[in-house]
């Protein structure tokens, strides 16, 4: 899988919050987006995940995300906010399963969900921590989750 952004900019009113950002990240790669508070990191990620309007191009395996319907996109990509935004203490498995809500709906049965969660836990090497409270994870483990 490859996620690419080309010349992405985000406006809030007349103020440009994100200016001309480009990146590409593929399976097995990590991408670090860093900067001071207010630099636009979360805004960029919100745009890439289709939560905010933007100019430029964001593609997943070469397909413009704006052309993808929400459900097929949610099957391939989800964004989970920072842990500080979570109001309750969940297990690792519960947090990973939250990524499936956009795919299936909050109150819908989740056929194949357990297998998808297991694959995700294995992909980030957290399968042995599945029942552990997220507040007990190290910083690196939280990032992988």
Regions found by a protein language model. Name each.
Residues 30-32:
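Short beta-strand immediately N-terminal to the Walker A/P-loop
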Residues 48-49:
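Helix-to-loop junction immediately C-terminal to a conserved catalytic motif
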Residues 56-64, 73:
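Conserved ABC transporter NBD signature motif
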Residues 133-137, 141:
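Conserved ABC ATPase signature
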Residues 34-36:
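The feature captures the beta-strand-to-loop junction immediately N-terminal to the Walker
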Residues 97, 111-129:
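Conserved ABC ATPase "signature" region
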Residues 88, 105, 130-131:
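Signature (C-motif/LSGGQ) region and adjacent switch/coupling loops
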Residues 3, 18-20:
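Conserved structural motif at the start of ABC-family nucleotide-binding domains
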């Amino acid at each position: 899988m490859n996620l690419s952004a080309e010349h992405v900019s985000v406006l809030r009113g007349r103020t440009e919050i994100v200016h001309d950002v480009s990146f590409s990240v593929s399976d097995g790669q990590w991408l670090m987006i860093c900067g001071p508070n207010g630099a636009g990191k979360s805004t960029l990620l919100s745009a890439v995940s289709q939560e905010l309007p933007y100019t430029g191009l964001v593609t997943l395996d070469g397909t413009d995300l704006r052309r993808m319907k929400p459900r097929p996109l949610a099957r391939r990509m989800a964004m989970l906010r920072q842990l500080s935004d979570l109001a309750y203490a969940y297990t690792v498995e519960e947090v990973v399963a939250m990524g499936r809500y956009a795919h299936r709906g909050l109150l819908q049965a989740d056929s194949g969900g357990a297998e998808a969660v297991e694959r995700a836990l294995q992909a980030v090497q957290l399968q042995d921590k599945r029942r552990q409270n997220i507040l007990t994870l190290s910083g690196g483990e939280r990032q992988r989750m």
